[in-house]
């Protein structure tokens, strides 16, 4: 992985290259780790490398649903709150029966979908920001 992203010719190519560069960083961080090492939390943080990979996979999926629906909102998740809460909590933890290879396969599939949308999405369409999350500024319109 190079230290700097390569030069680009236009906005869409820049977006694609930037996203691919960021995606590659997580693969590099996990390179050579065993499942046990990917699951480990050796610092005060409860996050592991495997948990981070699951989280970035999920965040790409959620944001790409928004990008695909823009300028409209994505379809509402109609599952019950307990199921959505379990999924949210599970997103940060590499479970005992999960493998790093499996997580990286899911990540690679989502990366491909993200890069596909970067090539096809309307870059002028405003992507709605969730209003139900406290970490998003209330004064952001898109």
For every predicted segment, state its role.
Residues 1-13, 58-117, 124-135:
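Short, helix-capping/interhelical loops that line the mouth of catalytic, cofactor-
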Residues 9-35, 54-55, 59-69:
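Alpha-helical bundle segments that constitute or directly flank the non-heme di-iron/ferroxidase center
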Residues 135-142:
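Individual transmembrane alpha-helices with interfacial aromatic-anchor signatures
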Residues 42-47, 140:
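Short, aromatic/basic-enriched loop-to-helix "N-cap" motif that marks the start
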Residues 31-38, 119, 123-126:
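Short, flexible helix-adjacent loops and helix caps
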């Amino acid at each position: 992985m190079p230290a700097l992203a390569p030069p680009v010719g236009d906005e869409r190519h820049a977006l694609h290259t930037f996203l691919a560069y960021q995606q590659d960083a997580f693969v590099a961080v996990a390179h050579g780790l065993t499942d046990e090492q990917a699951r480990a939390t050796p610092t005060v943080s409860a996050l592991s490398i495997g948990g981070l990979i699951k989280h970035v996979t999920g965040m790409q999926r959620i944001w790409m649903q928004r990008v695909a629906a823009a300028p409209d909102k994505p379809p509402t998740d109609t599952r019950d709150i307990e199921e959505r809460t379990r999924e949210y909590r599970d997103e940060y933890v590499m479970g005992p029966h999960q493998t790093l290879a499996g997580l990286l396969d899911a990540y690679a599939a989502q990366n491909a979908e993200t890069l596909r949308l970067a090539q096809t999405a309307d870059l002028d369409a405003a992507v709605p920001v969730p209003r139900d999350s406290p970490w998003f500024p209330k004064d952001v319109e898109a």
